[in-house]
Amino acid sequence: MTSIDILVIGHLERGADGSVVPSGTWSTSSLVRTDDGHNIVVDTSQGYMGAGIRSSFKQIGRIFPEDVDTVVLTHGHPDHIGNLGLFRNAEVLKFSGGDPMDGVTLLDTEKEIAKGVRFVRTPGHTEDSGSLFVDADRRYGPSAGESGEEGGPRLELRSR
């Protein structure tokens, strides 16, 4: 069965002065494990969250960052790309646009990464925004990777 695990959760809170500030990190990082053995990470969070990501892999068990086949970046901002070095065996995908990045495969059209897993260009706050759509027992999508509004990550669950 395809599964989705949250590695680190991006969360925003309202500061005393009314500004929006991260609580921990700005962006969420997730692990998708498919029926056919693909391991996909969506965003790698900010660099200082590396220990949290490694800890999540230990809690999940039987999988390590080196086992990840593909990393998809919902866009190229620093809070989404900070731990790419953890996934040294993975192909890294991002949609074209934004700043160029070494070692990243740029896409112009959607890509099926594994059966039932598609990376699709979607509107966002950057020209290179994309979302991962996953067909599972429940439909998960889109995974924009942003903390979104106050209150936590945006993950829309829709039943089939």
Where are these regions (language model features)?
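Short acidic loop-to-beta-strand element that houses the catalytic metal-binding Asp/Glu
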Residues: S29-L31, E110, S129-F133
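Beta-strand-turn-beta hairpins that frame and shape the catalytic cleft
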Residues: M1-I4, R33-N39, E110-R118, A136-Y140
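Metallo-beta-lactamase
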Residues: Y48, E127-R160
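Active-site metal-binding loops of divalent metal-dependent hydrolases
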Residues: I9-L12, D43-G47, G76, G124-T126, ...
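Divalent metal-coordination and catalytic microenvironments
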Residues: V32, D43, V68, H75, ...
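Active-site HxH/HxHxD metal-binding segment of metal-dependent hydrolases
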Residues: V20, T25-W26, T44-K115, E150
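Residue-level marker for buried hydrophobic side chains located in beta-strands
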Residues: I40-V42, V72, R139-S143
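Zn-dependent metallo-beta-lactamase
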Residues: M1-H38
